[in-house]
Regions:
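A compositional/biophysical signature of low hydrophobicity enriched in polar/charged and small residues
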Residues: 1-301
Length: 301
């Protein structure tokens, strides 16, 4: 792999954004890493040009919603998959299809039946995803330009560190404005609300800017919907080394599962993980450099 070195300032910016569970302003980022707002803005612009962006990792439970995972051990045709409420679709080379849907907490059963009726096939497994774990990358993998190495001691330290549950948040009603905000933040965590307003305005029938801002502050921020910010490093990694996209499904006790997930998601290229602690299952997706695969297998073993 070609050596890829980011400046220490850029790594500090990435590191800070990866550590917070809210959307900071440019001035706040600069203050936290000891840079001026203008320098911080230039660094973010430079990172974007290198395909390093930032997305919000969201916990929809704080909006009164839940996510369900349906696993099919067959490759389903795209046209048979119901699109309403669909959050993500993953099809692996091994022939597994994973469908993730969002629904209201009290409508899980009816939503599962809706999907099954549309597809016409019973899934092999169904899970209600009750926990989202945002990845906390070990920045030395980026700083040293060494995405082809795993620093086990660092990964184990990340996994073993205490992770307080944090304060609980109230859930109230959810409406299309909230969902639109979540969709925009999951594409770009640093997007300005005025740009969200412009985007929604193109569709038509949009409330005022003040209404959208109120929803953002009261429904998104105060309810703790944003649980982390993830640098999107997949394209950056793919530019500089041969990678394979892998789906990782893990099973175990709640404690071992949480520890294992936090360890592997400290590796750049891994995305947020979704868990059902009661059932003891978790899954995440990653763009993994080919040289890392044997080491990850050994680490998980």
């Amino acid at each position: 792999m070609k050596s890829v070195l980011l400046s220490p300032q850029a790594v500090r910016v990435i590191d800070y954004l990866n550590s917070v569970n809210h959307v900071p302003t440019i001035a706040e980022i600069g203050s936290a890493v000891g840079l001026s707002a203008s320098t911080t803005w230039r660094i973010l612009k430079s990172l974007r040009s290198q395909d390093i962006k930032f997305k919000a990792v969201t916990n929809l439970a704080n909006l009164g919603l839940t996510e369900i995972l349906l696993m099919y051990r067959t490759r389903l045709p795209i046209d048979r998959i119901p699109k309403k409420l669909l959050r993500s679709l993953i099809r692996t080379l091994e022939g597994v299809t994973l469908l993730r849907y969002v629904t209201k907490v009290h409508e899980v059963e009816s939503s599962v039946n809706y999907v099954i009726a549309g597809i016409g096939v019973e899934p092999s497994e169904v899970y209600v995803l009750d926990t989202v774990i945002p990845p906390k990358y070990v920045s030395t993998h980026i700083a040293r330009g060494s995405l082809d190495k795993i620093y086990l001691r660092e990964l184990i330290a990340v996994a073993s560190a205490p992770h307080p549950l944090g304060r609980s948040h109230s859930t109230g009603r959810v409406d299309p404005i909230d969902i639109a905000l979540v969709n925009e933040l999951e594409e770009d965590a640093l997007i300005k609300i005025k740009d969200v307003y412009k985007s929604m305005k193109k569709v038509g029938g949009v409330p005022s800017y003040q209404t959208i801002l109120k929803h953002y502050r009261v429904h998104i921020l105060e309810r703790g919907v944003i649980v982390g910010i993830r640098p999107t490093l997949e394209k950056f990694i793919e530019k500089h080394t041969a990678v394979t996209k892998k789906l990782l499904v893990m099973y175990g006790t709640p404690h071992s599962l949480s520890k294992g997930v936090r360890a592997v998601t400290a590796i750049p290229g891994f995305m947020e993980a979704y868990l059902n602690a009661k059932e003891g299952v978790a899954y995440t997706v990653a763009s993994i450099p080919l040289g890392l695969i044997p080491k990850i297998v050994d680490f998980l073993g």
